[in-house]
């Protein structure tokens, strides 16, 4: 198989890159270790609302992925899902062969790594017997908000995920208890204000400074969560239907460590002007890329995608792009607006 660009990672930034490359008449293959496109957006929080996508006051993660796939579809990107890139070999004539764990080989002129946080898994709290409850009444992500209708939920954690899901699930849950080791939450001031309002209204209860201590129940069904005060060691039992621990993700760059690319703090170091890595014709964009002043935002990843694609075009064709706005260029198969 041959193409212009191999994109490693089928998250929102990777999918958008197929569109951006297509606008420059470059073909793409996209490889991802997950069994469906969307990255964390579909794997961990498909119903989570996103508020900072231009033109959308609010859009769910799943809907964003669907829209991005529709946007890129005229350019017919080829997806290789449930596959992990093991090796990127240099060929003669300034090209690569990208090889996956199941033997798929794709020859290309450039590679864009849009692998997000790499291979990830949620951090599991050290609670005895927790495996019995996982995927039954203990979950590390929210796939369907309706599953929590009129339920009592314990949410553990003090970051954005814990705070954001507390706000969202408070719309359907009977009661939410938020367990955190500290009084301060690592979330936006606006979200913190919402938490305080929800607590005043009795929709949630902030249980601080406490940590998870023990689970009670049987046959995979939780009946209570026991928490312990950090200072006094006092224990408190909270009746609950579900526990949602949000303690972040464990990153594993896996084979990326062996690709001969400069890394820093488990990220790929890039030139912020071009998104080039230390290896010629290999680029990195989105959360996996690091440079001074980096903002880990989806919209920033979209901009990085455009910058990388324009530089790749210049490298491949040995000349800069003859720039055209999308309104002038149009998209094959799509009618221009009158």
UniProtKB/Swiss-Prot annotation:
GO terms for molecular function: ferredoxin-NADP+ reductase activity; flavin adenine dinucleotide binding; NADP binding. Keywords: FAD, Flavoprotein, NADP, Oxidoreductase. Its cofactor is FAD. InterPro entries: FAD/NAD-bd_sf, FAD/NAD-binding_dom, Fd--NADP_Rdtase_type_2, Ferredoxin-NADP_redctase_2. Its EC number is 1.18.1.2. It comes from the Bacteria. It catalyses: 2 reduced [2Fe-2S]-[ferredoxin] + NADP(+) + H(+) = 2 oxidized [2Fe-2S]-[ferredoxin] + NADPH. SUPFAM superfamilies: FAD/NAD(P)-binding domain (SSF51905). FAD binds at residues 32, 40, 45, 85, 120, 287, 327. Binds 1 FAD per subunit. Homodimer. Belongs to the ferredoxin--NADP reductase type 2 family. This is Ferredoxin--NADP reductase. It comes from Wolbachia pipientis wMel.
């Amino acid at each position: 198989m041959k193409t212009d660009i191999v994109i490693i990672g089928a998250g929102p930034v990777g999918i958008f890159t197929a569109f951006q490359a297509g606008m420059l008449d470059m073909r793409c293959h996209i490889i991802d270790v997950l069994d469906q496109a969307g990255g964390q957006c579909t794997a961990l929080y498909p119903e989570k609302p996103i508020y900072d996508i231009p033109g959308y006051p609010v859009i769910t993660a799943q809907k964003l992925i669907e829209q991005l796939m529709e946007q890129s579809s005229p350019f017919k990107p080829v997806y290789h899902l449930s596959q992990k890139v093991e090796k990127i070999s240099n060929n003669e004539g300034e090209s690569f062969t990208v090889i996956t764990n199941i033997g798929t080989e794709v020859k290309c002129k450039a590679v864009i790594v849009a692998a997000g946080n790499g291979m990830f898994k949620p951090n599991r709290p050290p609670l005895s017997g927790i495996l019995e409850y996982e995927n039954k009444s203990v979950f590390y992500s929210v796939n369907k908000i309706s599953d929590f209708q009129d339920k009592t939920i314990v949410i553990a954690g003090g970051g954005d995920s814990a705070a954001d899901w507390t706000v969202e699930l408070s719309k359907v849950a009977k009661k939410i208890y938020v367990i955190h080791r500290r009084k301060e939450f690592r979330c936006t001031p606006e979200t913190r204000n919402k938490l305080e309002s929800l607590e005043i209204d009795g929709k949630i209860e902030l249980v601080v400074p406490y940590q998870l201590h023990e689970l009670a129940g049987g046959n995979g069904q939780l009946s209570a969560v026991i928490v312990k005060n950090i200072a006094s060691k006092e224990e408190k039992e909270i009746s609950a239907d579900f526990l949602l621990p949000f303690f972040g993700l464990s990153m594993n760059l896996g084979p990326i460590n062996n690709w001969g690319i400069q890394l820093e703090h488990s990220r790929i170091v890039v030139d912020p002007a071009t998104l080039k890595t230390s290896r010629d014709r290999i680029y990195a964009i989105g959360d996996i890329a690091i440079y001074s002043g980096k903002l880990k935002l989806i919209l920033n990843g979209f901009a990085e995608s455009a910058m990388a694609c324009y530089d790749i075009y210049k490298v491949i064709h040995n000349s800069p792009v003859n720039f055209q706005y999308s309104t002038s260029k149009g998209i094959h198969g799509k009618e221009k607006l009158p």
